[in-house]
């Protein structure tokens, strides 16, 4: 159940981000992936913090903290990998 709520929060973060940018000129509505993940990741963290706060047992808290840490590590590695890929891609493209 926690995964489903986290996924919903993530997607609502994307929806919020799109809503905020709706009235901007068309060329300003497009953004890089790392920016796109900002609001969605923030929404996930709100849910993770609330879930952790409501945990009843130490075992539940430890499991939730473990999931939170795994997600944070995956996100940081994902963002860094995308940055390296995009930097190399555009550098190679610029060279021809």
Q: What is the role of each PLM region?
A:
Residues 1-96:
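Cation-handling catalytic/transport regions enriched in His/Asp/Glu
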């Amino acid at each position: 159940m926690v995964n489903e709520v986290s996924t919903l929060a993530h997607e609502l973060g994307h929806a919020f981000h799109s809503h905020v940018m709706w009235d901007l000129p068309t060329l300003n509505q497009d953004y890089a992936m790392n920016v796109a993940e900002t609001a969605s990741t923030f929404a996930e963290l709100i849910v993770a913090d609330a879930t952790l706060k409501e945990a009843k047992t130490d075992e539940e808290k430890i499991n939730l903290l473990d999931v939170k840490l795994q997600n944070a590590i995956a996100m940081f590695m994902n963002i860094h990998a995308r940055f390296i890929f995009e930097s190399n891609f555009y550098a190679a493209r610029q060279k021809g």
